[in-house]
A protein has these predicted regions:
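Alpha-helical transmembrane segments and their membrane-interface boundaries
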Residues: 1-210
């Protein structure tokens, strides 16, 4: 059961334990979990690299980050509608970076702004979860390590597999959350005058101009 605790939960347990022997045991279990996660990360990226090619190792990183986030995070909307958000996010990751690399810098800037802004709206309505950093980072990595031809087809295939995996994990862990907001509420509640949405726009502009 202790292995199933989150990082925060493990640290709280260690701090709350007064018996030195028990504290050492909790620390050893926590360190074991850290090494286990590292081994899992290396295995996932290596598997993706072997299946989709070395040029697509970044796909493994992107999917891995998404899986680690969606194990615990949510989108602040109904779980079934959250699956739609995941579909939208991965569709952007499959197409946005490729399209922006096909055009000149000025059109590419506007494409990136739109894509990153959509990633923020779809993936970061619940700001506390910090989902935005994962998906925006994945977008920038895929854009920076662009591929064409057969390698791009493999990239899309790898992202499709990752999307399905994320959907399964997300639904399994979040299906009992009682959210009333729907997918469309993500767009209905968009207001350029709100602090959250101004932050969305600033981040999209900054990331696109980098």
């Amino acid at each position: 059961q202790e292995l199933q605790l989150s990082s925060v939960g493990s640290k709280q347990l260690i701090r709350a334990t007064e018996d030195k022997k028990e504290k050492r045991r909790h620390i050893l279990i926590y360190n074991f979990k850290v090494y286990l996660v590292m081994a899992f990360c290396v295995a996932v990226v290596s598997l993706y690299s072997s299946l989709t090619g070395k040029d697509n190792s970044v796909v493994g990183v992107t999917v891995l980050l998404a899986v680690l986030v969606l194990r615990q995070a949510d989108f602040g909307i109904r779980t079934t509608h959250g699956l739609g958000s995941i579909l939208g996010i991965f569709t952007i990751l499959m197409t946005g970076p490729r399209i922006s690399n096909l055009v000149s810098p000025v059109p590419a800037f506007f494409i990136n702004v739109i894509c990153i802004l959509l990633l923020m709206i779809l993936g970061c309505h619940n700001v506390i979860m910090y989902n935005h950093s994962t998906f925006v980072l994945g977008y920038l990595l895929l854009q920076g390590y662009d591929v064409t031809g057969k390698m791009y087809v493999r990239r899309v295939e790898g992202l499709l597999v990752g999307m399905i995996l994320c959907m399964i994990i997300f639904y399994k862990n979040q299906k009992n959350r009682p959210y009333r907001r729907t997918f469309l509420d993500l767009f209905r509640e968009f207001d350029v005058h709100s602090a959250r949405n101004r932050w969305y726009i600033r981040l999209a502009l900054i990331a696109s101009s980098a």
